[in-house]
Amino acid sequence: YIKEFITDNFIEQFTQRIANVVSRQFNKQNPQLEAETSELRVTIVHESVARSGRTISIRKTPPIIRLTEEKAVQENFCEEKILALLINCVKNRCNMIFCGMPGIGKTECIKFFSQYIPQNDRVITIEDTMEIRYSATNPGKDCVEMRVQAGRFDYADAIKSSLRLNPRWIMLSEARSKEVKYLLES
């Protein structure tokens, strides 16, 4: 059934609809297309750069905290003592870095530990695709959510701007190049 439904024609129409919604071109000259809704993140890579053919990834990014303390221990994310240590690190304003392979749960960990940030601490999130959703998962807390945009407002710009807003916390969704330098200097 799925092979009959997901035809080349369907994939082309789906891609064009996404491109139209975000007002972007998708072709050999513009081979990557990204879009998001309140709960989904869509990435499409053109067949001119993906040798296996057009690639589509649809990821759920709900504005909820899915991980609980009980689940973290029961599903062997970490031992209870380690979890308590990490929660206390957040409560005591320690710097933390979450790294790992794509899809491993870095954003879910950030969302989980963010609930332990003290109520009055100003938090600034800096993301290219809004996935942390701090304001939604931590209602009533002081938060500024920034979105970076290639060529207009990059991570380095966002970090510089956020420092003028007197944050207690800066959360970056990605740190790959010069933004690491700016973050460490802040």
Predicted features and spans:
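Switch/coupling sub-region of P-loop NTPases
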Residues: 93-99, 112-186
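Walker A (P-loop) phosphate-binding loop of P-loop NTPases
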Residues: 103
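P-loop NTP-binding catalytic core
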Residues: 2-92
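Conserved lysine of the Walker
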Residues: 106
